[in-house]
Amino acid sequence: MPAKEVAVCSNSFNGTIGETIIFKNNHSSAVDITQNGTATWPFATPPATPSPCVPAKSGNTEGTLSVTLLSTPGTYTYNTVGCPQIADVNPKTVIIS
């Protein structure tokens, strides 16, 4: 089964435990994914430190970053830095079931 693709600047998404997600960035600036304060980091990989980065779009090619969701169901939050102002709403939410 191919990995689910999610726009890195979207406000929320649903996933399943241990699922691989491909964050896609179609903007001209890179987007960092950061921990929401002391909230549980929703990704098994990569770690929260250093903050993972989804590269900027290059030509017609979107930047991508592969992440793996935790194996514990729940609602988790994280932040992004670098999304266009209209999409730069934090925290973002992922519901893992």
What are these regions (language model features)?
Residues 4-6, 46, 51, 86:
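N-terminal targeting/disorder module
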Residues 52-97:
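Extracellular/periplasmic metallocenter environments
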Residues 24-27:
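Asparagine-centered strand-capping/turn motif at beta-strand->loop junctions
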Residues 38-60:
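Low-complexity "stalk/linker" and mucin-like segments enriched in Ser/Thr/Pro/Ala/Gly
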Residues 19, 29-33:
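Short beta-strand/loop motifs in extracellular/secreted proteins, especially
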Residues 1-21:
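N-terminal edge beta-strand
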Residues 29, 47, 82-84:
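A generic structural signal for solvent-exposed, polar alpha-helical segments
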